[in-house]
Amino acid sequence: MNILVTGIHGFVGSNLVVALKERHSLYGLDIVAPEKEGVVKTFFWKDIEPASFPMRNLPEFDAIIHLAGKAHDTKNRSAAQSYFDINTGLTQKIFDFFLESSAKKFVFFSSVKAAADSVVGDMLTEDVVPAPVGPYGESKIAAENYILDKLKVENGKLK
């Protein structure tokens, strides 16, 4: 499979490359584009902008794994808008790119912070009503909602 991985130079992306490189052709999409062992090519974010780099110049992808994002800032030094620009805005761009592409699979890594800031009891379950606290969690749930709003539901399943 040809797989495009966003955030390929981050912690999860770097480890995912190690796990997938033997069986798949991996491409990266990141804010930096140095060569990386196991990756055919890494593109910059601007490369998926149709006006500056038409999609016909990109390889065809079978799947897109979206890991890129702005991590929560435990020291609270980041401006709130930067979370929305990156976590929500870039997710919108990459999901729209996916919808226009030939890829059949899209995997989005969000965050537990999209659902809750803390867990009452032993675990957080899927039936929790999202109540994010702060711009990090709010930007992640906004990205999730954007994707869900774009999807079709058929016979109770997301398509």
Where are these regions (language model features)?
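Short alpha-helix in the Rossmann-fold core of NAD(P)-dependent oxidoreductases
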Residues: 84-91, 107, 139-140
